């Protein structure tokens, strides 16, 4: 069986401290998982490895059965891997749309961004007024903008 994400024996150390030691997990499509543990247990380290912010010392990852080695967050995003940060990184005085356009790279046209946002809103039930000022949004709405 292919898993959406499979992690095998990921280890990451910082000097002589092992943040992650032989971590393995398998995620099927549609499943929801949570990483739970004390402060310093290595949860953020593992997420950063999956997202391409950190490189593991050893181990391997697979997306849909294909070896996956992100070089950076851009590489991870190209494989459909994203990350939502605990604290918002939005410009409060700008609209939702302006924040989303600022976050785009590679000279994507405004029309392409609007089409992509429309599709995401439909596919993931992330409906928001794109002309609303971010400061007026609830915390949940801001989280939706971060996801988009």
Q: Positions of the model-derived regions?
A:
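Glycine-rich phosphate-binding loops of nucleotide-dependent enzymes
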Residues: 1-148
